Amino acid sequence: MQLLHISDTHLGKRQYNLESREKDVYDTFTQLIDIAINEHVKAVIHTGDLFDVNNPPNRAKLHAIKELKRLKDHNIPFICIAGDHDSPKRKEEIYPQRILEEFNLIKILQKIDNRVKLENVEVYGISHISNVSVNDLKEQLSKVKPETRKSILMLHQGIRTYLPYQGAWQIELSDLPKGFSLYAVGHLHSRRKDYLDGGALIEIAGSPDIMREEEIEDYQKSKKGATLIDMSGDLPSINYINVNIRDQLVLDINVDKIEQSIESVIQKLKENVKNDKKPILHIELEGTVPIRKDVLMTKLQALRDYVEHYRIYKNNIVSIKEENLKTKLKTTYSSLNDIIADYLKGIGYTDEETKIIIDIINEEDEKKVEELLKKFAGVEDK
């Protein structure tokens, strides 16, 4: 029996406020549904963030309805949990998935005691629980005991092993309940898989499109798409199926030789982009000569015929003066007094005047400070 695992589709997301990027997200979802139909899977499991927000735009809801109807026409159930993006932010709100469930297009699993039986495979799921309710999450996980080894647990949570940053994770691998053969996880946008003791598999499908520039490096290595899961053996096996998405690249432009650098970027775009869609370009500025913003923006317009959108991702320009100062600070000065002395001499103070000023700064005795001030002013007591 084969299942298709997808996650973090973020329908309705309008990256960089571009209509073309919103359409890209819809196109990617259509490709995922095509894969499910073409592979004749038993079901699709979606591990959270079907929508980008809890109140998605009408276009996003309409696209979801159209594509999910295609699945239903092929008798392929769509089993999902909610993620942090599409979960309600107020108690009186509902999951947008509930509207789809009302029309029998999907089955949403909200708590751990919800489950779906697919032939001899049990699918459990728990929708996203935030940091403030992490104890409730751990309690729910501690109570679940699958009735069969061929069982799947769907989660949309930060796991410390994969998101080891303060506030980014809610559970550790040790919090996962025992007895499942597959833990299908959403939330992380890059593909991952790990085997636990006993052969159980943690499988992270990742987002099927590039939602943040931090995902570009991993996309270039592992691509994006869906995970085909074969549950027919004693342990699950997986196979990645990629989708065709708009490329995104991070490239340097050196402002010291900006025309030449832009021409080099254009050449790289021609060589590396094989997609029919123009790419998104994230620019890292390099160089040592500051450039006026209006001049920079005018020069960058040469890229417009080759990219869908470009943006300054990082500004790494460091002027020669700044670089020299940093080098001097690292190699020349042994103390704060040396830095102050160098500055004072640089603006015209004599060695003697510089010494007096530094003595005034360092002196704690008020009477001695008064004497030094008089000496500096040339009005010492006779």
Swiss-Prot record:
Keyword tags: DNA damage, DNA repair, Endonuclease, Exonuclease, Hydrolase, Manganese, Metal-binding, Nuclease
Induction context: Part of the nurA-rad50-mre11-herA operon, these genes are cotranscribed.
Coiled-coil region: none
Active site: 85 (proton donor)
Residues engaged in binding Mn(2+) 2: 49, 84, 156, 187
Entry EC number(s): 3.1.-.-
Signal peptide per UniProt: none
CDD domains: MPP_Mre11_N
Activity regulation details: Nuclease activity is regulated by Rad50.
GO biological process: double-strand break repair
Lineage: superkingdom: Archaea
Catalytic EC class: hydrolase
Co-factor: note: Binds 2 manganese ions per subunit.
One of the record's GO molecular function terms: Y-form DNA binding
Residues reported in the UniProt entry to bind Mn(2+) 1: 8, 10, 49, 189
Pfam (any one): Metallophos
Cofactor(s) the record lists: Mn(2+)
Gene3D superfamilies membership: 3.60.21.10
Entry's family note: Belongs to the MRE11/RAD32 family.
Subunit and interaction comment: Homodimer. Forms a heterotetramer composed of two Mre11 subunits and two Rad50 subunits. Interacts with Rad50 and HerA.
Biological role: Part of the Rad50/Mre11 complex, which is involved in the early steps of DNA double-strand break (DSB) repair. The complex may facilitate opening of the processed DNA ends to aid in the recruitment of HerA and NurA. Mre11 binds to DSB ends and has both double-stranded 3'-5' exonuclease activity and single-stranded endonuclease activity. Recruited immediately to chromosomal DNA after gamma irradiation, and remains DNA bound in the course of DNA repair.
Official protein name in the record: DNA double-strand break repair protein Mre11
